[in-house]
Amino acid sequence: MDVKRSFLFLQGPHGPFFRKLGEELSRRGALVTRVNLCGGDFLDWPSHSCNYRGRTSDWSEWIGDLMAKKEVTDLLVYGDWRPHHREAVHIARLHGIRVWAFDEGYLRPDWITMEEGGVNGNSTLPNDPESVRSECQDCTCEPGAIQTENPLFKRQLKAWWYGFFSFVGLPFFPFYRTHRPYSHCAELFSGWIPHFFTAKKRMASSEKALRRIGDTPYFLFPLQLDSDSQVRRYSPFSGMKEAIAYIMTSFAQHAPQDTLLVIRNHPLDNGLIRYDRFIRSFSRACGIEERTVFVESGNGREMIRKARAVVLLNSTMGLQALEMGKSVYCVGKAIYAMPGLAENGAQDSLAHFWKSPLAPDAKLLRDFEKVVRCRTLINGNFYFGEGMKLAVQGCADKLLK
């Protein structure tokens, strides 16, 4: 007799996506349990859920008991590296429970990532050309995606509301501490709110900086969120300022004198770190103030198109750059860093890359993206309209397959 599937949801992307996916799985006959850890979680899934208000030191035993009581067969988490998630994942694996990790799409736009076992640094995707080509031969998925609307402002709004409710919910979840390096209170009142009111000025400054570049050849360095696990767990750096210092120093020492370094901020940055001030100060110390350009915004694809090459930690912008035929160097651990695609320290030094960047192998890239789509991607988005509905249906189909 088939065992009835029992899905346990922990924290998901900001907004109702996990709740809607749970409702769809329940409609199809599965058992669904959700655990809220903070006020933001409660906002996203207020009913038919349970709240954990205990200490972090008691979490492992509590979640293990819940898994046994609910006879959980599948654990769903957004990001497998958060402390609460990490402990739950270990317990789930011990008891043979499937782990499904979600994240923004490895390929964008119009895709989300849902990978069994783990994502990013914990991914089991093939990481050498021979394995990629071998697995690609068995892939039968369709290459196209239905385009969906996914406005950046709506994503920011969901993040703001999540942070606000996490802050006001502290009396009800007194022991919860965010996995992020800053509290929700600090992010909201010292970051997002002043960041919002200076947006117009910052955009004007960015437009002026982009005009200054003109036809000068440049290397593009797209920043990632300072709180991103890709930065803090899967790179040699403790945060983005350390990464910026490393890359700027290398650029000053080894890049051709006729090139610029264009540093683009992440569009969802909360504004707590004044990157403009730090980069201005550090560029002066390195003697490259006139060769360094920092922008808060700008069309990412257009900036990639005009760049000589792209240097980054492990952002998915690296895959976009490879798709556009650009050379990419990863300073951190990335799923696409392998011979023939993006370079990294295992293949060559950053010092050499500034002078002689290697173009990607287009056929290998097509094979790799096909494997990624077949193994990990669902068409749609986490946040808005028809794209969310599409992703919910696709995830439910795959989970119950």
Task: Report each predicted region and the residues it spans.
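Active-site and donor-binding regions of nucleotide-sugar-utilizing enzymes
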Residues: H14-K20, L37-V132
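Leloir-type glycosyltransferase catalytic cores
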Residues: P126-L170, G340-K401
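A short helix->loop->beta-strand "cap" motif at the edges of active sites that frequently abuts
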Residues: L94-V99, T259, G325-K326
